[in-house]
């Protein structure tokens, strides 16, 4: 037996043994309750970072705990393997995307296995594997059959030099292509969409079912769906039979409309533009349509517009208002047109000030109209009194309507209903529910993604690829230049195929799917990962799902989680699933931050100084000698503040790295990397090692003496069962790993300080400490468990249950106060009642001195805590 803790040797040994024993295989015993523990799977970049280690360690602790608690556990891992980096590697280094990706997967799998995670690698999936994306394509066809997939024109980022579509991340802050440097244009292309809006209401309402999710994540999703209740109103165009439809959540402001605004892409822009304005309007539209949506809607940028020369009629007042085109109106939102009410909207107010447009206040604060008579003279007459009230900024609050015809004097709430009712009766409006959520654009003009499985036939139109012909395999004989559009579109031998329906020469769809498609159903495939005949066997998937605990970053709070919920509901409606929501509980772990140095006198990339170039005792810029400032920031290559997991493991071992990550901060909080604290956890594991190995080396046989336990034995047993209770509650209730480890430290200290190390209670304590440590530090726990003479793995042991009787102390410490000031504390029987506690307190010699010669006016007894004498 080695007297020193040598993590490298024992970790390698036990990882190999666990594989041989198959300890991490998914158990299928139907008599056990199931538990599905899942981390969000990674993109195979080639190397793990500390954020990965934190994510997977958290999930691993939960999975190990649940196995020991008697659950059959599914704890899989896979790879979100399609995406742009692999294609860029092909362009820059001439390495095929598949080769680059699978090399990275191999490397990262080895790194994950080095962490000793209890993952069932038999369930591993990679989204770029044909046996996975075959079913991604099959699911797409389910959407197509259900009428939930369709094509329409949509704007993309277009590089005019390379003649290719760019992802948003390939466009810099100046609107230039990352590769060619060309000013990026916006171009309309025919794109594929999924009708997520058909499920908007259910996606919103079912957030209430997610009681195990953080409230802020549910709020983010609700805001993204963006349900609003308002009105659809029509403004006739002067000199035309056409009408401009607008959507507004504030119909109560309609009498304050001073202009109507169209999106530059709106089909009525040409019709409403006069000849004198045509050239200026065309120029403006060209400028705006080359801007991204973010640029157009950024709050910190002034809103730009141009008058068309055309006019529309406010259907409530009969007055003509000018029609404008503005950059901030997006055609994809609402109707692509808005009514401008500068008096009651901040954005409209700034726009009106910039272009000198009228600002007419039609709602006022109740106190500001208290002196006006806003009552009609009869039921058939309107209020004719004009109320001259102006504010120096937009008044956006609800209030009392003024200068609003028959609706004057109403509250905003009442007026909204009355105005919509009036518009409905007159035929130029109606009530309408609107969602911010838009249909999901899934087309990507790239190679490294799942091909969309349809064929375009000149006779039959869009033809689904038959199931028997799936998967549509990505061809390997592709040239990657970064120019000329999608590489697939240039490969005629792949594009040109006969129509499956009529045999006519036809063409494959050359777009691939958004990689969010792949990650929107992977958790379902894990339940039946080797099924070659179907996407999954519904009985198996319905048995394992929903995921009991999902762990991942807050950055996925909206898109990935929303899309996964959408896919689950669609596949349920297709008869494949029998549940509504995919993830029962969600834990969004915080970021891992490193100590970061920066030169405040520099900017951009030059601002950051890699930590390995800095003397932490006197941090200075190695180039200029200027003093550096420091802060904690999320680890990244650009900041040079990262810590390589393999370096930490080589120095301290996997278990120490796990313990630090779990102990340093609650899981939902950001974690500041501090090597001193890493060393602290290493010292703790060394103490546990010595504690157990010294016990084993002593060769003591626990005495099974009969009769009552001694006081010290009772105290130790209470410490043992307090640890069991506290660690279990910390793990089960809210995953407070840091406080659970604190309890392990307390138990370790109690065992170190204990007398009678040959007692059966001490033996119970040693074994309990090792078992409780197992989910956190699995390798050292396994080694110590075997040293204690056990032949089976510690990870197959039953998680201990605390004995409530052991938690009850024979005696407690009673604090005695006189007029609220502590005067003494004494040991009293724990079962003493109020009268007995007062009696013990009065018998204290110290207290008697403080009470001598004084009148006791009141005695306050708090059972189990204190007695307070109030004296005069």
From Swiss-Prot:
Its main location: cytoplasm. One of its GO terms (biological process) is leucyl-tRNA aminoacylation. ATP binds at residue 637. PROSITE patterns: AA_TRNA_LIGASE_I. GO terms for cellular component: cytosol. A motif ('HIGH' region) lies at residues 42-52. It is found in: Cytoplasm. A motif ('KMSKS' region) lies at residues 634-638. It catalyses: tRNA(Leu) + L-leucine + ATP = L-leucyl-tRNA(Leu) + AMP + diphosphate. CDD domains: Anticodon_Ia_Leu_BEm, LeuRS_core. InterPro entries: aa-tRNA-synth_I_CS, aa-tRNA-synth_Ia, Leu-tRNA-ligase, Leu_tRNA-synth_edit, M/V/L/I-tRNA-synth_anticd-bd, Methionyl/Leucyl_tRNA_Synth, Rossmann-like_a/b/a_fold, tRNAsynth_Ia_anticodon-bd. SUPFAM superfamilies: Anticodon-binding domain of a subclass of class I aminoacyl-tRNA synthetases, Nucleotidylyl transferase, ValRS/IleRS/LeuRS editing domain. GO terms for molecular function: aminoacyl-tRNA deacylase activity; ATP binding; leucine-tRNA ligase activity. It holds the Pfam family tRNA-synt_1_2. Keywords: Aminoacyl-tRNA synthetase, ATP-binding, Cytoplasm, Ligase, Nucleotide-binding, Protein biosynthesis. Belongs to the class-I aminoacyl-tRNA synthetase family. This is Leucine--tRNA ligase. It comes from Nostoc sp. (strain PCC 7120 / SAG 25.82 / UTEX 2576). The gene is leuS.
């Amino acid at each position: 037996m080695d007297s020193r803790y040598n993590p490298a040797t024992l970790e390698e040994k036990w990882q190999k043994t666990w594989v041989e024993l198959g300890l991490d295989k998914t158990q299928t015993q139907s008599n056990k309750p199931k538990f599905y523990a899942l981390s969000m799977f990674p993109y195979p970049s080639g190397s793990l970072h500390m954020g990965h280690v934190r994510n997977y360690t958290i999930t691993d602790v939960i999975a190990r705990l649940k196995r020991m608690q008697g659950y059959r556990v599914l704890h899989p891992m896979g790879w979100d393997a399609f995406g742009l980096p692999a294609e860029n590697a092909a362009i820059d280094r001439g390495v095929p995307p598949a080769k680059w990706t699978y090399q990275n997967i191999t490397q990262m799998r080895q790194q994950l296995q080095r962490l000793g995670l209890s993952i069932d690698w038999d369930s591993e999936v990679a989204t770029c594997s044909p046996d996975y994306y075959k079913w991604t394509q099959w699911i797409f066809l389910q959407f197509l059959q259900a009428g939930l997939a369709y094509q329409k024109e949509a704007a993309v980022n277009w590089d005019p030099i390379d003649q290719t579509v760019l992802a948003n991340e390939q466009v810099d802050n100046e609107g230039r292509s990352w590769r060619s440097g060309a000013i990026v244009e916006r171009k309309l292309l025919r794109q594929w969409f999924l009708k997520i809006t058909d499920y908007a209401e259910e996606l919103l309402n079912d957030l209430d079912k997610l009681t195990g999710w953080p409230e802020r994540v549910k709020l983010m999703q609700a805001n993204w769906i963006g349900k609003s209740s308002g009105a659809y109103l029509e403004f006739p165009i002067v000199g035309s039979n056409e009408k401009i439809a607008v959507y507004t959540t504030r119909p109560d402001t309609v009498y304050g409309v001073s202009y109507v605004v169209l999106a530059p892409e709106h089909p009525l822009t040409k019709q409403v533009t006069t000849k004198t304005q045509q050239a200026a309007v065309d120029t403006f539209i060209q400028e705006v349509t080359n801007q991204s949506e973010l640029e157009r809607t950024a709050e910190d940028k002034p809103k730009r517009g141009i008058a068309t020369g055309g006019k529309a009629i406010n259907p409530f007042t009969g007055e003509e208002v000018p029609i404008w085109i503005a950059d901030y109106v997006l055609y994809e939102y609402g109707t692509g047109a808005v009514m401008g009410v500068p008096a009651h909207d901040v954005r409209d107010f700034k726009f009106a000030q910039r272009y000198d447009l009228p600002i007419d206040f039609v709602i006022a604060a109740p106190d500001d109209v208290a002196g006006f008579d806003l009552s009609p003279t009869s039921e058939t007459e309107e209020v004719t009194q004009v109320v001259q009230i102006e504010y120096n900024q937009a008044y956006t609050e609800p209030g009392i309507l003024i200068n609003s015809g028959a609706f004057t004097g109403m509250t905003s709430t009442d007026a909204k209903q009355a105005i919509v009712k009036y518009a409905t009766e007159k035929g130029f409006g109606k009530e309408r529910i609107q969602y911010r959520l838009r249909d999901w654009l899934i087309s990507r003009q790239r190679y490294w993604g799942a091909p969309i499985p349809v064929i375009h036939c000149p006779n039959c139109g869009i033809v689904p690829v038959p199931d028997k012909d799936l998967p549509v395999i990505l061809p390997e004989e592709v040239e990657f230049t970064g120019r000329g559009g999608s590489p697939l579109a240039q490969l005629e031998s792949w594009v040109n195929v006969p129509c499956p329906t009529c045999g006519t020469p036809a063409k494959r769809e050359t777009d691939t799917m958004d990689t969010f498609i792949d990650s929107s159903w992977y958790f379902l495939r894990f339940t039946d990962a080797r099924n070659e005949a179907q996407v999954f066997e519904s009985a198996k998937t319905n048995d394992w799902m929903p995921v009991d605990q999902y762990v991942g970053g807050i950055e996925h709070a909206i898109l990935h989680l929303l899309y996964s919920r959408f896919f689950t509901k669609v596949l349920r409606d297709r008869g494949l699933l029998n549940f509504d929501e995919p993830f029962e509980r969600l834990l969004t772990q915080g970021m891992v931050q490193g100590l970061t140095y920066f030169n405040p006198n520099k900017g951009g990339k030059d601002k950051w100084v890699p930590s390995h170039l800095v003397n932490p005792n006197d941090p200075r810029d190695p180039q200029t000698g200027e003093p550096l400032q420091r802060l904690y920031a999320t680890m990244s290559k650009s900041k040079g503040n990262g810590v390589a997991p393999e370096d930490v493991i080589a120095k301290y071992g996997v278990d120490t790295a796990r313990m630090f990550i779990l102990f340093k901060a609650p899981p939902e909080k950001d974690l500041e990397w501090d090597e001193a604290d890493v060393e602290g956890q290493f010292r703790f594991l060394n103490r546990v090692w010595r504690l157990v190995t010294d016990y084993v080396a002593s060769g003591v046989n626990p005495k099974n003496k009969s009769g009552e336990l001694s006081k010290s034995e009772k105290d130790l047993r209470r410490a043992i069962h307090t640890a069991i209770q506290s660690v279990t509650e910390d793990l089960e209730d809210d995953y407070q790993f840091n406080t659970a480890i604190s309890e392990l430290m307390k138990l370790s200290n109690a065992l170190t300080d204990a007398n009678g190390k040959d007692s059966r209670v001490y033996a119970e304590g040693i074994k309990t400490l090792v078992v409780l440590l197992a989910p956190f530090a699995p390798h050292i726990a396994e080694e110590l468990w075997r040293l204690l003479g056990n032949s089976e793995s510690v990870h197959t042991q039953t998680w201990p249950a605390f004995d409530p009787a052991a938690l009850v102390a024979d005696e407690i410490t009673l604090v005695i106060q006189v007029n609220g000031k502590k005067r003494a504390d004494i040991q009293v029987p724990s079962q003493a009642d109020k009268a007995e506690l007062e009696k013990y307190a009065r018998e204290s010699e110290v207290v008697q001195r403080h009470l001598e010669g004084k009148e006791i006016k009141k005695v306050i007894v708090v059972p189990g805590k204190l007695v307070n004498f109030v004296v005069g």
